[in-house]
């Protein structure tokens, strides 16, 4: 049985491929987008349960995209985990204020990423999604 659909949004092609291959190997239906506009295009046809969102994207950044997704009744229930290479003080607060459900620092720990994703998906299923 296939696992949950996931969208990975990152402007670094190496990161996109690494995470997609890792998640596909764990049984997830993983799709990718290299910027916010492409992510919005993918979301017209693909409804992920979770988005791994790079917060530093060209054009519209990942936090603004998250705000838009959480403001839209059709996409607000998608779990969004922020990805950033800059684990600076205050980043976790900024990502949560934008509507992200969690925060993962880059480089991604390939040993724990599938389990981390499973935890967030299980938590979302238990709570029936966010009501905000």
PLM segments and residue spans:
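Conserved phosphotransfer cores of two-component systems
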Residues: 44-46, 68-78, 98
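C-terminal output helix
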Residues: 96, 108-117
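Charged docking surfaces used in two-component/phosphorelay signaling
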Residues: 17-25
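Active-site residues of response regulator receiver
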Residues: 54, 84
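Acidic, metal-coordinating helix/loop segments flanking the phosphotransfer/catalytic sites
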Residues: 32-50
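The feature encodes the CheY-like receiver
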Residues: 16, 58, 76, 88, ...
């Amino acid at each position: 049985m296939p696992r949950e659909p996931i969208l990975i949004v990152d402007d670094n092609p190496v990161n996109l491929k690494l995470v997609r291959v890792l998640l596909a190997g764990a049984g997830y239906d993983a799709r990718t987008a290299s910027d916010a506009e492409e992510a919005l295009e993918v979301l017209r046809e693909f409804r992920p349960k979770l988005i791994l969102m790079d917060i530093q994207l060209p054009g519209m950044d990942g936090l603004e995209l998250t705000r838009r997704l959480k403001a839209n009744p059709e996409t607000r229930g998608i779990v969004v985990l922020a990805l950033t290479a800059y684990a600076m003080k205050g980043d976790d607060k900024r990502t949560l204020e934008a509507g992200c459900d969690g925060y993962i620092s880059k480089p991604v720990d390939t040993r724990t990423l599938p389990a981390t994703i499973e935890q967030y998906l299980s938590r979302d299923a238990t709570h029936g999604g966010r009501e905000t």
